[in-house]
């Protein structure tokens, strides 16, 4: 018998930016499907109307397109099991909820907000978690019909047992058993007629033929309630893949509410989308080798969801920055230059050889947004301290720097504009170094410092001189001498 085609879904709520955790869920769902030549479906979960944010659906589409996580079915591309927007499926959920009522697996609840608030206050006073007391389960058929005829607002609740236990399997966390006494009678249909996230998920996953459900491990505790719904309907339970949380540090989860970076933030900071996707793949999954750099195609080939870890993953900014640098170095010079020019133009207004700057920075750059700070001195020499001239390794001191700059200045002034190139400047300066019998760094470090006013520069003394030109280089050397006196 042929195995069932794998179908996974990414089902985000359009409530704002694409968080790193959401993108990882999308990536893992995509990889599970595509590893087995299956289908990846996009479903928009907009049942919580109060939290919807204008433009958030476009962010979802744009992020998936940008990262190459192309969906086979969804609101924008269609498919055979649509509609793919939950608010457009309202009638479907109500029909299934009423079916559960008929089976005794759900019931109408007419409790007022005041009564529910009182129950919550009582639970708080007793320091117990709030749990609905099944008050409306005991209404007679006549009482229910009378309430409906009056038009009283209602919700439909799941009818969970209070004794025994429910067991389910998760491919990451194994067999999990929960006492039924801990299960609340969760709301399936809200008073506005829309389903809750939990109920819509189960109905849609079944109707859309989803075989593997990928989500965060915060949903582990809800899984027994989902399973009871599947069993009540007589449906197959999908394979659960609950992913470990992504942590900011050992104590705090990564959270947009705490100002942690979204995917859009990372792109705006100068991270390459390929690097971000690669890094996110490794937040909870290990290929079993020391390899760390993977294209989306390579991830699709190697990914096995059984290798996802139970342990929380720490979002390490330094590691992401390193990985981004690896991806930048894989770019051709022309590709890097195209990405870098907008960053250069943020700080450079004068005419510079931008391609030469890219040639210097390409192998050193880890983050595109760092580029402006690395070259801003070209436009205008910053104020700097003479402490910069002190460099132990270069054997450079304030005194030696003044002495050597005063000796090199006339050499630089004598170079004709027609000979203003790296090789010629190098030749003349090294002739001086040799005649003075000093270490190379004792001359080159002060020249570089005087030309840049910075401890880090895209190139050495000669590259900076070429970029700045003869006139500006002489002007800056003179300023350095004045500062050191």
Curated annotation (Swiss-Prot):
Q: Which GO terms describe its biological process?
A: glutamyl-tRNA aminoacylation
Q: What is its EC number?
A: 6.1.1.17
**Location of this chain's protein in the cell:** Cytoplasm
- Provide the alphabetized UniProt keywords: Aminoacyl-tRNA synthetase, ATP-binding, Cytoplasm, Ligase, Metal-binding, Nucleotide-binding, Protein biosynthesis, Zinc
User: Which domain of life does the protein's organism represent?
Assistant: Bacteria
Instruction: Indicate whether Aminoacyl-tRNA synthetase appears among the record's keywords.
Output: yes
Cystine pairs annotated here are none
> Which InterPro entries does the UniProt record give?
aa-tRNA-synth_I_cd-bd, aa-tRNA-synth_I_codon-bd_sub2, aa-tRNA-synth_I_CS, aa_tRNA-synth_I_cd-bd_sf, Glu-tRNA-ligase_bac/mito, Glu/Gln-tRNA-synth, Glu/Gln-tRNA-synth_Ib_cat-dom, GluQ/Sye
List ligand-binding residues for Zn(2+): 109, 111, 136, 138
Q: Where is this motif: 'KMSKS' region?
A: 253-257
Q: Which enzyme class? A: ligase
GO MF terms on file?
ATP binding; glutamate-tRNA ligase activity; tRNA binding; zinc ion binding
Query: Per UniProt, where does ATP bind?
Result: 256
Cofactor requirement: Zn(2+)
* Cofactor descriptive note: Binds 1 zinc ion per subunit.
PROSITE patterns referenced in this protein's UniProt entry, alphabetically? AA_TRNA_LIGASE_I (PS00178)
Catalyzed reactions: tRNA(Glu) + L-glutamate + ATP = L-glutamyl-tRNA(Glu) + AMP + diphosphate
For this record, the Gene Ontology CC terms, alphabetical, are: cytoplasm
Q: Where is this motif: 'HIGH' region?
A: 12-22
Q: What does the UniProt function comment say about this protein?
A: Catalyzes the attachment of glutamate to tRNA(Glu) in a two-step reaction: glutamate is first activated by ATP to form Glu-AMP and then transferred to the acceptor end of tRNA(Glu).
HAMAP family to which the protein is assigned, alphabetical: Glu_tRNA_synth_type1
What does the annotation say about its assembly with partners? Answer: Monomer.
Q: Which family does it belong to?
A: Belongs to the class-I aminoacyl-tRNA synthetase family. Glutamate--tRNA ligase type 1 subfamily.
For this entry, the protein name equals Glutamate--tRNA ligase
**Origin species:** Clostridium botulinum (strain Eklund 17B / Type B)
Organism lineage reads as: Bacteria, Bacillati, Bacillota, Clostridia, Eubacteriales
Q: What gene is it encoded by? A: gltX
